[in-house]
């Protein structure tokens, strides 16, 4: 599985090593040409059968489990490759990314029901972004309300 990784994050010591190991595609979010290059590269790899992890918020922030604005451009990969989108809800991941300690952090990872091309193929990029975000937001609300037991993984 590949990762579309922001240049600023990728330049950090540990991240740089991980990027090399997983053959990540690095994207400079401040450079429009590089954004296009990276999205085209990811699209090509997805069409050839490789899976990619993309953070549509454009990076990690101290978000306190609140979704940030999704960057619609990253959904070009899915629209052009006509592949399913698997939304992933990450709960408490911000705690590990914005800390200067090596303390243990429990992060919940919820893989949601895949969204097939037949469900989003007629939508524009911005609409796909909102559709995916709404699915993740629904799961985040369930987690916050205690409706999802963190000790097991539930798909759907």
Residue ranges and their predicted role:
Residues 1-32:
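Catalytic core of membrane glycerolipid acyltransferases/transacylases, capturing the structured
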Residues 36-156:
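Non-catalytic C-terminal accessory region of glycerolipid acyltransferases
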